[in-house]
């Protein structure tokens, strides 16, 4: 890969190596989270009785286990492009009128791999926060969360849909218009479970025993 800015040499290589180590480390930690939630719950704690915070953490962990491998693969491919002069992401390039020895690569492939990780990553951050907000509202309204099962399925639905919206970051990349239409539609659909959560928060607060002191 051509060096264009200061730090684009060894700095980029170290960043790619650190990303790879991060994904490997998270995979071990993520498996720990998933197995603990599925196999080490206390007696009587069924899945549909777990706090919504735990549901948020569990769903976010599943998302990370599915999304981070795309980041790992893209980091490895970019490292190979940089070190071994492969052409995963490098198209044919002209330099001072001379064709460099690259060919067949696609920068768009890197965008797809990055955003396949990048958009679920938004919900990896957000879903545990949604769960915390749900439990805090329930505690301080002094009533059970409104529509608990609906809230659980909303968390799961947001997580599932997050894998079908990544290309809405790439509308100007020259993708097929029908491809763009599909991702625009899924982007609109993901607003439905999100709105369900907000309305359930409001209904939990409605006539709750809230004290501000």
Where are these regions (language model features)?
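Membrane-embedded and interfacial regions of multi-pass energy-transducing membrane proteins
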Residues: 1-213
